[in-house]
A protein has these predicted regions:
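Structural detector of well-ordered beta-strand residues that form the stable sheet scaffold
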Residues: 84, 109, 130, 183-184, ...
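Glycine-/small-residue-rich active-site loops that bind phosphorylated ligands and cofactors
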Residues: 114, 137-138, 164, 215, ...
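PLP-dependent aminotransferase class I/II
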Residues: 69-72, 80-81, 144, 156-160, ...
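Buried hydrophobic packing segments
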Residues: 92-100, 118, 223, 257
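Conserved residues at the C-terminal ends of beta-strands
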Residues: 86, 111, 160, 210, ...
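Active-site PLP attachment segment
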Residues: 202-235, 247, 251-256
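PLP-dependent aminotransferase-like
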Residues: 102-187, 194
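Conserved PLP-binding active-site segment in aminotransferase class I/II-type PLP enzymes
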Residues: 1-91, 95, 99, 177, ...
Length: 412
Protein backbone atom coordinates (compact mmCIF):
# COMPACT_ATOMS: atom_id res chain seq x y z
CA UNK A 1 0.00 0.00 0.00
CA UNK A 2 1.37 3.42 -0.92
CA UNK A 3 1.69 6.14 1.66
CA UNK A 4 1.43 9.87 1.19
CA UNK A 5 4.51 11.34 -0.53
CA UNK A 6 6.71 13.79 1.30
CA UNK A 7 7.40 17.21 -0.20
CA UNK A 8 10.22 15.71 -2.25
CA UNK A 9 7.85 13.10 -3.70
CA UNK A 10 9.26 10.18 -1.67
CA UNK A 11 7.10 7.84 0.35
CA UNK A 12 6.76 8.49 4.04
CA UNK A 13 7.90 4.98 4.98
CA UNK A 14 11.24 3.25 5.43
CA UNK A 15 11.14 0.96 2.41
CA UNK A 16 14.08 1.30 0.05
CA UNK A 17 13.09 -1.11 -2.70
CA UNK A 18 14.58 0.49 -5.81
CA UNK A 19 12.12 -1.37 -8.02
CA UNK A 20 9.24 0.34 -6.24
CA UNK A 21 10.72 3.76 -6.99
CA UNK A 22 11.52 2.93 -10.60
CA UNK A 23 8.58 3.73 -12.92
CA UNK A 24 6.75 0.64 -14.13
CA UNK A 25 7.15 1.80 -17.72
CA UNK A 26 10.92 1.44 -17.19
CA UNK A 27 10.60 -2.01 -15.62
CA UNK A 28 9.84 -1.10 -12.01
CA UNK A 29 7.00 -2.31 -9.84
CA UNK A 30 3.57 -0.89 -10.56
CA UNK A 31 2.01 1.15 -7.77
CA UNK A 32 -1.36 -0.50 -8.46
CA UNK A 33 -0.54 -3.88 -10.02
CA UNK A 34 -4.21 -4.90 -10.17
CA UNK A 35 -4.82 -1.97 -12.49
CA UNK A 36 -7.69 0.52 -12.50
CA UNK A 37 -10.98 -0.61 -10.96
CA UNK A 38 -13.75 -1.72 -13.27
CA UNK A 39 -17.10 -0.11 -13.89
CA UNK A 40 -19.93 -0.50 -13.13
CA UNK A 41 -19.44 -1.53 -9.55
CA UNK A 42 -20.68 -4.88 -8.29
CA UNK A 43 -23.90 -3.59 -6.71
CA UNK A 44 -26.30 -5.94 -4.91
CA UNK A 45 -29.16 -3.45 -5.38
CA UNK A 46 -28.77 -3.73 -9.14
CA UNK A 47 -28.50 -7.52 -8.89
CA UNK A 48 -31.72 -7.67 -6.86
CA UNK A 49 -33.61 -5.54 -9.39
CA UNK A 50 -32.44 -7.77 -12.22
CA UNK A 51 -33.38 -10.96 -10.38
CA UNK A 52 -36.90 -9.66 -9.73
CA UNK A 53 -37.30 -8.47 -13.30
CA UNK A 54 -36.14 -11.74 -14.84
CA UNK A 55 -38.27 -13.81 -12.45
CA UNK A 56 -41.36 -11.80 -13.36
CA UNK A 57 -40.76 -12.03 -17.11
CA UNK A 58 -41.39 -8.29 -17.42
CA UNK A 59 -37.93 -7.58 -18.78
CA UNK A 60 -39.17 -8.33 -22.31
CA UNK A 61 -42.21 -6.04 -22.24
CA UNK A 62 -42.54 -3.11 -24.62
CA UNK A 63 -44.35 -1.00 -22.04
CA UNK A 64 -43.61 -1.96 -18.46
CA UNK A 65 -43.57 -0.08 -15.18
CA UNK A 66 -39.87 0.72 -14.89
CA UNK A 67 -39.52 3.16 -17.79
CA UNK A 68 -42.27 5.51 -16.54
CA UNK A 69 -41.00 5.10 -12.97
CA UNK A 70 -37.51 6.19 -14.05
CA UNK A 71 -38.97 9.18 -15.90
CA UNK A 72 -40.84 10.25 -12.76
CA UNK A 73 -37.80 9.73 -10.53
CA UNK A 74 -35.52 11.78 -12.79
CA UNK A 75 -38.15 14.51 -13.11
CA UNK A 76 -38.42 14.77 -9.32
CA UNK A 77 -34.65 14.62 -8.85
CA UNK A 78 -34.09 17.47 -11.32
CA UNK A 79 -37.26 19.41 -10.45
CA UNK A 80 -38.37 19.50 -14.08
CA UNK A 81 -41.77 18.70 -15.52
CA UNK A 82 -40.80 16.60 -18.52
CA UNK A 83 -38.28 13.74 -18.86
CA UNK A 84 -38.14 11.77 -22.10
CA UNK A 85 -36.00 8.64 -22.05
CA UNK A 86 -34.12 7.48 -25.13
CA UNK A 87 -31.44 5.11 -26.37
CA UNK A 88 -28.27 7.22 -25.85
CA UNK A 89 -26.89 10.58 -24.83
CA UNK A 90 -26.09 11.24 -28.48
CA UNK A 91 -29.73 10.62 -29.41
CA UNK A 92 -30.76 12.90 -26.54
CA UNK A 93 -28.74 15.78 -28.02
CA UNK A 94 -30.29 15.18 -31.44
CA UNK A 95 -33.78 15.17 -29.93
CA UNK A 96 -32.97 18.33 -27.99
CA UNK A 97 -31.92 20.08 -31.20
CA UNK A 98 -35.12 18.98 -32.90
CA UNK A 99 -37.15 19.95 -29.86
CA UNK A 100 -35.94 23.56 -29.89
CA UNK A 101 -36.68 23.79 -33.60
CA UNK A 102 -33.24 23.71 -35.23
CA UNK A 103 -33.75 23.45 -39.00
CA UNK A 104 -31.51 23.12 -42.08
CA UNK A 105 -29.10 26.06 -42.50
CA UNK A 106 -29.64 27.26 -38.92
CA UNK A 107 -26.48 27.85 -36.90
CA UNK A 108 -25.74 26.21 -33.55
CA UNK A 109 -22.98 27.53 -31.29
CA UNK A 110 -20.82 25.03 -29.38
CA UNK A 111 -17.34 24.91 -27.92
CA UNK A 112 -14.40 24.18 -30.19
CA UNK A 113 -13.41 21.57 -27.59
CA UNK A 114 -16.40 19.26 -27.10
CA UNK A 115 -17.55 15.69 -27.62
CA UNK A 116 -17.57 15.11 -31.37
CA UNK A 117 -21.09 13.65 -31.43
CA UNK A 118 -22.50 17.08 -30.56
CA UNK A 119 -20.88 18.51 -33.70
CA UNK A 120 -22.15 15.61 -35.79
CA UNK A 121 -25.67 15.96 -34.40
CA UNK A 122 -25.80 19.51 -35.71
CA UNK A 123 -24.74 18.26 -39.13
CA UNK A 124 -27.35 15.49 -38.90
CA UNK A 125 -30.03 18.18 -38.94
CA UNK A 126 -28.26 19.85 -41.90
CA UNK A 127 -27.55 22.81 -39.66
CA UNK A 128 -24.18 24.58 -39.33
CA UNK A 129 -21.89 24.11 -36.30
CA UNK A 130 -20.31 27.40 -35.22
CA UNK A 131 -17.28 26.79 -33.01
CA UNK A 132 -16.58 29.11 -30.09
CA UNK A 133 -13.32 29.11 -28.15
CA UNK A 134 -13.04 27.84 -24.59
CA UNK A 135 -11.97 29.65 -21.45
CA UNK A 136 -8.16 29.72 -21.04
CA UNK A 137 -8.36 28.59 -17.40
CA UNK A 138 -11.17 26.03 -17.38
CA UNK A 139 -11.23 24.84 -21.01
CA UNK A 140 -15.03 25.01 -20.89
CA UNK A 141 -17.25 27.04 -23.24
CA UNK A 142 -16.31 30.72 -22.86
CA UNK A 143 -19.42 32.95 -22.69
CA UNK A 144 -17.29 35.99 -23.54
CA UNK A 145 -16.71 34.57 -27.02
CA UNK A 146 -20.37 33.98 -27.87
CA UNK A 147 -21.30 37.47 -29.04
CA UNK A 148 -18.84 37.46 -31.93
CA UNK A 149 -20.31 34.18 -33.20
CA UNK A 150 -23.97 35.21 -33.36
CA UNK A 151 -25.64 35.98 -36.70
CA UNK A 152 -29.22 36.26 -37.89
CA UNK A 153 -29.10 32.50 -38.56
CA UNK A 154 -28.11 31.47 -35.03
CA UNK A 155 -30.78 29.31 -33.40
CA UNK A 156 -29.24 27.56 -30.37
CA UNK A 157 -26.27 27.04 -28.07
CA UNK A 158 -24.96 23.68 -26.84
CA UNK A 159 -23.15 24.08 -23.50
CA UNK A 160 -21.32 20.92 -22.33
CA UNK A 161 -19.92 20.43 -18.83
CA UNK A 162 -16.78 18.36 -19.44
CA UNK A 163 -14.27 16.36 -17.39
CA UNK A 164 -15.60 17.43 -13.99
CA UNK A 165 -15.56 21.08 -15.03
CA UNK A 166 -18.61 23.27 -15.38
CA UNK A 167 -19.55 25.90 -17.92
CA UNK A 168 -20.43 29.31 -16.40
CA UNK A 169 -23.98 28.35 -17.20
CA UNK A 170 -25.70 31.32 -15.56
CA UNK A 171 -23.84 33.69 -17.90
CA UNK A 172 -24.53 31.48 -20.93
CA UNK A 173 -28.21 31.36 -20.04
CA UNK A 174 -28.38 35.14 -19.70
CA UNK A 175 -26.72 35.52 -23.09
CA UNK A 176 -29.11 33.04 -24.71
CA UNK A 177 -32.14 34.82 -23.27
CA UNK A 178 -30.88 38.23 -24.36
CA UNK A 179 -30.40 37.02 -27.94
CA UNK A 180 -33.50 34.84 -28.22
CA UNK A 181 -31.49 31.62 -28.53
CA UNK A 182 -32.38 28.16 -27.26
CA UNK A 183 -29.96 26.72 -24.70
CA UNK A 184 -29.19 22.99 -24.67
CA UNK A 185 -27.25 21.98 -21.55
CA UNK A 186 -25.23 18.79 -22.00
CA UNK A 187 -24.89 17.25 -18.53
CA UNK A 188 -23.91 13.78 -19.80
CA UNK A 189 -20.62 13.97 -17.88
CA UNK A 190 -22.02 15.78 -14.84
CA UNK A 191 -25.21 14.07 -13.63
CA UNK A 192 -26.27 15.30 -10.23
CA UNK A 193 -23.82 18.21 -10.14
CA UNK A 194 -25.02 21.36 -8.39
CA UNK A 195 -24.30 24.81 -9.84
CA UNK A 196 -25.45 27.83 -7.85
CA UNK A 197 -28.11 25.72 -6.16
CA UNK A 198 -29.50 24.06 -9.31
CA UNK A 199 -28.85 20.68 -10.89
CA UNK A 200 -26.72 20.51 -14.00
CA UNK A 201 -29.07 19.90 -16.89
CA UNK A 202 -31.80 22.23 -15.61
CA UNK A 203 -30.40 25.63 -16.61
CA UNK A 204 -31.36 25.49 -20.26
CA UNK A 205 -34.46 25.07 -22.35
CA UNK A 206 -33.36 21.45 -22.59
CA UNK A 207 -30.90 19.32 -20.64
CA UNK A 208 -29.47 15.97 -21.69
CA UNK A 209 -28.11 12.97 -19.79
CA UNK A 210 -26.24 9.86 -20.90
CA UNK A 211 -26.47 6.35 -19.46
CA UNK A 212 -23.59 4.99 -21.55
CA UNK A 213 -21.37 2.16 -20.35
CA UNK A 214 -18.78 4.22 -18.48
CA UNK A 215 -21.08 6.98 -17.23
CA UNK A 216 -21.88 7.65 -13.57
CA UNK A 217 -25.42 6.42 -14.26
CA UNK A 218 -25.02 3.44 -16.56
CA UNK A 219 -27.22 0.95 -18.34
CA UNK A 220 -24.69 0.18 -21.06
CA UNK A 221 -26.60 2.55 -23.33
CA UNK A 222 -29.32 5.12 -22.84
CA UNK A 223 -30.07 8.78 -22.40
CA UNK A 224 -32.64 11.31 -21.27
CA UNK A 225 -33.99 14.69 -22.33
CA UNK A 226 -35.03 17.08 -19.54
CA UNK A 227 -37.15 20.15 -20.16
CA UNK A 228 -39.51 22.45 -18.24
CA UNK A 229 -41.27 23.37 -21.49
CA UNK A 230 -44.34 21.50 -22.69
CA UNK A 231 -43.94 22.72 -26.28
CA UNK A 232 -40.45 21.22 -26.55
CA UNK A 233 -41.57 17.95 -24.96
CA UNK A 234 -44.50 17.66 -27.38
CA UNK A 235 -42.33 18.40 -30.40
CA UNK A 236 -39.92 15.63 -29.38
CA UNK A 237 -42.77 13.19 -28.73
CA UNK A 238 -44.21 13.83 -32.18
CA UNK A 239 -40.83 13.03 -33.69
CA UNK A 240 -40.11 9.82 -31.77
CA UNK A 241 -43.60 8.25 -31.71
CA UNK A 242 -44.02 6.52 -35.07
CA UNK A 243 -46.54 3.85 -34.20
CA UNK A 244 -43.91 2.75 -31.70
CA UNK A 245 -41.01 4.53 -30.03
CA UNK A 246 -38.11 5.16 -32.41
CA UNK A 247 -35.47 5.82 -29.72
CA UNK A 248 -36.56 3.58 -26.81
CA UNK A 249 -34.95 2.76 -23.49
CA UNK A 250 -35.76 -0.82 -22.47
CA UNK A 251 -37.44 -2.02 -19.30
CA UNK A 252 -34.24 -3.77 -18.22
CA UNK A 253 -32.16 -0.62 -18.70
CA UNK A 254 -34.64 1.48 -16.75
CA UNK A 255 -34.75 -1.06 -13.92
CA UNK A 256 -30.96 -1.05 -13.63
CA UNK A 257 -30.88 2.74 -13.46
CA UNK A 258 -33.45 3.17 -10.69
CA UNK A 259 -31.21 2.16 -7.75
CA UNK A 260 -28.32 4.10 -9.26
CA UNK A 261 -30.30 7.35 -9.24
CA UNK A 262 -31.07 6.78 -5.56
CA UNK A 263 -27.38 6.58 -4.65
CA UNK A 264 -26.05 9.21 -7.08
CA UNK A 265 -25.83 12.05 -4.54
CA UNK A 266 -24.00 9.89 -2.02
CA UNK A 267 -21.52 8.65 -4.62
CA UNK A 268 -20.95 12.14 -6.02
CA UNK A 269 -20.19 13.38 -2.50
CA UNK A 270 -17.63 10.60 -2.06
CA UNK A 271 -16.02 11.48 -5.38
CA UNK A 272 -15.70 15.11 -4.35
CA UNK A 273 -14.01 14.13 -1.08
CA UNK A 274 -11.58 11.95 -3.06
CA UNK A 275 -10.85 14.79 -5.49
CA UNK A 276 -10.13 17.18 -2.63
CA UNK A 277 -7.77 14.63 -1.08
CA UNK A 278 -5.98 14.04 -4.37
CA UNK A 279 -5.59 17.79 -4.87
CA UNK A 280 -3.97 18.08 -1.45
CA UNK A 281 -1.61 15.17 -2.14
CA UNK A 282 -0.52 16.53 -5.53
CA UNK A 283 0.06 19.97 -4.06
CA UNK A 284 3.37 21.33 -5.28
CA UNK A 285 3.34 19.50 -8.61
CA UNK A 286 3.49 22.23 -11.21
CA UNK A 287 2.16 21.37 -14.63
CA UNK A 288 -0.80 19.23 -13.54
CA UNK A 289 -3.70 21.51 -12.65
CA UNK A 290 -7.25 20.28 -11.94
CA UNK A 291 -9.91 21.88 -14.14
CA UNK A 292 -12.41 22.16 -11.30
CA UNK A 293 -12.39 21.57 -7.58
CA UNK A 294 -15.52 21.73 -5.42
CA UNK A 295 -16.41 25.24 -4.24
CA UNK A 296 -19.22 26.79 -2.22
CA UNK A 297 -21.21 27.39 -5.41
CA UNK A 298 -20.20 24.38 -7.51
CA UNK A 299 -20.43 20.71 -6.53
CA UNK A 300 -19.23 18.81 -9.62
CA UNK A 301 -19.95 15.22 -10.55
CA UNK A 302 -16.67 13.68 -11.67
CA UNK A 303 -17.29 11.33 -14.58
CA UNK A 304 -13.69 12.05 -15.42
CA UNK A 305 -11.42 14.39 -13.51
CA UNK A 306 -9.77 16.74 -15.96
CA UNK A 307 -6.29 18.22 -15.65
CA UNK A 308 -4.36 20.82 -17.63
CA UNK A 309 -0.99 19.25 -18.41
CA UNK A 310 2.21 21.18 -19.20
CA UNK A 311 5.04 18.98 -20.41
CA UNK A 312 7.70 21.62 -19.71
CA UNK A 313 7.11 21.05 -15.98
CA UNK A 314 7.79 17.33 -16.47
CA UNK A 315 11.20 17.56 -18.19
CA UNK A 316 9.53 17.56 -21.60
CA UNK A 317 7.54 14.38 -20.95
CA UNK A 318 4.67 14.58 -23.41
CA UNK A 319 1.06 14.42 -22.31
CA UNK A 320 0.59 11.07 -24.08
CA UNK A 321 3.73 9.50 -22.63
CA UNK A 322 2.75 10.74 -19.16
CA UNK A 323 -0.61 8.99 -19.58
CA UNK A 324 1.15 5.80 -20.74
CA UNK A 325 3.44 5.98 -17.71
CA UNK A 326 0.54 6.35 -15.28
CA UNK A 327 -1.34 3.55 -17.03
CA UNK A 328 1.70 1.34 -16.41
CA UNK A 329 1.37 2.23 -12.72
CA UNK A 330 -2.25 1.04 -12.78
CA UNK A 331 -3.78 4.54 -12.86
CA UNK A 332 -6.35 5.28 -15.58
CA UNK A 333 -5.13 8.54 -17.12
CA UNK A 334 -6.08 9.31 -20.73
CA UNK A 335 -5.96 12.13 -23.23
CA UNK A 336 -9.11 14.20 -23.55
CA UNK A 337 -11.16 14.88 -26.68
CA UNK A 338 -9.85 16.18 -29.96
CA UNK A 339 -10.48 19.80 -30.86
CA UNK A 340 -13.46 19.79 -33.22
CA UNK A 341 -11.74 22.17 -35.64
CA UNK A 342 -8.79 19.79 -35.88
CA UNK A 343 -10.75 16.70 -36.94
CA UNK A 344 -13.34 18.18 -39.31
CA UNK A 345 -13.06 19.88 -42.66
CA UNK A 346 -13.35 23.66 -42.47
CA UNK A 347 -16.16 23.40 -45.00
CA UNK A 348 -18.32 21.73 -42.36
CA UNK A 349 -18.26 24.48 -39.71
CA UNK A 350 -17.80 28.17 -39.09
CA UNK A 351 -15.49 29.74 -36.51
CA UNK A 352 -14.91 33.39 -35.69
CA UNK A 353 -11.27 33.05 -34.60
CA UNK A 354 -8.38 30.59 -34.53
CA UNK A 355 -9.71 28.63 -31.50
CA UNK A 356 -6.33 28.87 -29.82
CA UNK A 357 -7.51 27.66 -26.41
CA UNK A 358 -9.43 24.75 -27.94
CA UNK A 359 -6.16 23.75 -29.62
CA UNK A 360 -4.40 23.95 -26.26
CA UNK A 361 -7.09 21.78 -24.69
CA UNK A 362 -6.66 19.27 -27.52
CA UNK A 363 -2.93 19.08 -26.78
CA UNK A 364 -2.97 19.36 -23.00
CA UNK A 365 -6.10 17.78 -21.55
CA UNK A 366 -5.62 14.79 -19.27
CA UNK A 367 -8.46 12.88 -17.64
CA UNK A 368 -8.52 10.50 -14.70
CA UNK A 369 -11.28 7.91 -15.04
CA UNK A 370 -13.78 8.05 -12.19
CA UNK A 371 -14.10 4.52 -10.65
CA UNK A 372 -11.04 4.96 -8.43
CA UNK A 373 -12.67 8.02 -6.82
CA UNK A 374 -15.03 5.66 -4.97
CA UNK A 375 -12.16 3.63 -3.52
CA UNK A 376 -10.32 4.13 -0.22
CA UNK A 377 -8.11 7.00 0.91
CA UNK A 378 -5.19 4.64 0.37
CA UNK A 379 -6.11 4.29 -3.31
CA UNK A 380 -6.14 8.07 -3.73
CA UNK A 381 -2.75 8.27 -2.02
CA UNK A 382 -1.45 5.65 -4.46
CA UNK A 383 -2.50 7.86 -7.38
CA UNK A 384 -0.63 10.79 -5.84
CA UNK A 385 2.45 8.65 -5.27
CA UNK A 386 2.34 7.36 -8.85
CA UNK A 387 2.25 10.94 -10.16
CA UNK A 388 5.23 11.93 -8.01
CA UNK A 389 7.04 8.75 -9.04
CA UNK A 390 6.65 9.46 -12.75
CA UNK A 391 7.58 13.11 -12.31
CA UNK A 392 10.82 12.24 -10.51
CA UNK A 393 11.89 10.02 -13.40
CA UNK A 394 10.40 12.09 -16.22
CA UNK A 395 13.71 12.90 -17.90
CA UNK A 396 14.75 9.23 -17.88
CA UNK A 397 11.40 8.19 -19.34
CA UNK A 398 11.82 10.77 -22.11
CA UNK A 399 15.28 9.46 -22.96
CA UNK A 400 14.38 5.76 -22.92
CA UNK A 401 10.78 5.39 -24.13
CA UNK A 402 9.61 6.30 -27.64
CA UNK A 403 6.75 8.75 -27.48
CA UNK A 404 3.40 7.41 -28.61
CA UNK A 405 -0.12 8.63 -28.92
CA UNK A 406 -2.82 7.88 -26.38
CA UNK A 407 -6.02 7.95 -28.40
CA UNK A 408 -8.20 10.94 -27.64
CA UNK A 409 -11.92 10.48 -27.06
CA UNK A 410 -11.26 7.45 -24.86
CA UNK A 411 -14.59 6.22 -23.50
CA UNK A 412 -13.63 3.47 -21.07
Amino acid sequence: MATVPNDDGNRGDSRSDRSADCPAILGGTSVRPAGPPGWPLDDERVHAVLRRLIASGDWGRYHGEHVPELSRKLAKYHSVEHVLLCCSGTAAVELALRGVGVSPDDEVLLAGYDFKANFQNVLCLRAIPVLVDVDPETWQLNPERLAAAVTSKTRAIIASHLHGGVVPIREVRQFAEAHGLALIEDACQNPGAMIDGRRAGTWGDVGVLSFGGSKLLTAGRGGAVLTPRSDIAERIKRYVLRGNEAYPLSEMQAAILLPQVEQLDEQNARRRVAVERLCRQRNGIAGLTPLQIPTEDVSPAYYKMGFRYRSEEFSGLSRDLFARSLRAEGVAFDAGFRGLHLIHSKRRFRAVDDLLEASRADAGMLTLHHPVLLESDAAIDEIAFAIHKVRRSASEIVSRIPDGCVTNDAEL
